[in-house]
């Protein structure tokens, strides 16, 4: 009886040890610190600054631009130092993304949440020379709330 208990106890310890998690292989975590920060958006204290998309200038990386939302007021374009280059007023935009369409330029997409029943995607072209946005219009994206974009 005592021998059976020992076998059962050893088996239990072995099974418990097999359940231990093993850290995932990979490089250790490295802290990343900001070297620049944007000023608070127009609608301060409203949890409105959100969702940046970065256009990387391959020819001159320091001239890359960031497009980000002020969910209550519109879209900002920032330089990499966090300085605003332009602002496009347009209430209720969120979930911004951009795509390099080569000859057609950089197209910026943002979910237009001004009509929660009929979702739309607002479209802009990013003028990379001036750091401004040119509104192209919007397209319907189906019934319901426009909350994100799948590329």
Where are the regions that the model predicts?
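Bacterial N-terminal signal peptides that target proteins for export
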Residues: 1-9
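C-terminal motif of bacterial Sec signal peptides marking the signal peptidase cleavage site
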Residues: 16-18
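Sequence/structural signature of beta-propeller domains
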Residues: 20-151
């Amino acid at each position: 009886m005592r021998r059976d208990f020992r076998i059962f106890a050893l088996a239990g310890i072995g099974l418990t040890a097999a359940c231990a998690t093993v850290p995932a292989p990979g490089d250790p975590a490295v802290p990343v610190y900001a070297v620049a920060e944007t000023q608070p958006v127009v609608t301060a204290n409203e949890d409105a600054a959100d969702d940046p998309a970065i256009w990387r200038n391959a020819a001159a990386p320091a001239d890359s631009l960031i497009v980000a939302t002020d969910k209550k007021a519109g879209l900002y374009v920032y330089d990499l130092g966090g300085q605003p280059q332009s602002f496009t007023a347009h209430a209720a935009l969120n979930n911004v993304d951009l795509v390099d369409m080569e000859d057609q330029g950089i197209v910026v997409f943002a979910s237009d949440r001004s009509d929660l029943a009929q979702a739309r995607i607002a479209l802009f072209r990013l003028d990379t020379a001036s750091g401004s946005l040119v509104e192209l219009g919007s397209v319907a994206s189906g019934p319901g709330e426009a909350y994100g974009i799948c590329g």
